[in-house]
Amino acid sequence: MAQNPIVTITMENGDVIKAELYPEIAPNTVNNFISLINHNFYDGVIFHRVIKGFMLQGGDPDGNGTGGPGYEITGNGFKNDLKHTAGVLSMARTMIPDSAGSQFFIMHKDAPHLDGEYAAFGKVTEGMDVVDKIACVTTDYMDRPLEDQKMKTVTVETFGVEYPEPETV
C-alpha cells in the first residue's frame, strides 16, 4: 500500500506543522488540497479565524473568510468516520454541503458536533505545539488574529503517487 501524502506548512516565523492526508477517507478533498498546494495557492495565506479551544481556519486568499479558489468541490459521497479531534484537518464550507473550496481548519481541541458534518481529511503528525501557539494569539471580536498568522509555504510529499484534479460542482 502506498504511503499517505504528508503536508508541510511552514509559517512565516519558521514554525512547522506536518500533517498526514487520508485519501482513503476523503479522496476528492485530498485531491483538491494537493492540487491547490501544487499550484502554490496557500503560500502567503493567513489563518484568518482562530478560536482557542476550537480551531484555526485558513486557506482564504482574501484573508477574510469569503474567498476561495473560484470553484467548489463535490462531497465525497460516502460516510466519513474521521472524528474532529485535536489536530484533525477538515474543510470549511457554507451551510451548503457541496460548497468547500480552499478554506480548511485544524482542530485545536475535540469538537464532536462537527463529526459527519464536515469533510475531515488529515491529521497533524508534527507541530501540535505550533497549533497550540497559534490558537493562543490575541484575536479581535471576529476571531481574527491581531498579528497575521501567515503560512509562508505549504508543500506536499506524495511519495510518487499521482493524485487527480478534484471533481468540482
Please describe what each predicted stretch is.
Residues 1-169:
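Cyclophilin-like peptidyl-prolyl cis-trans isomerases
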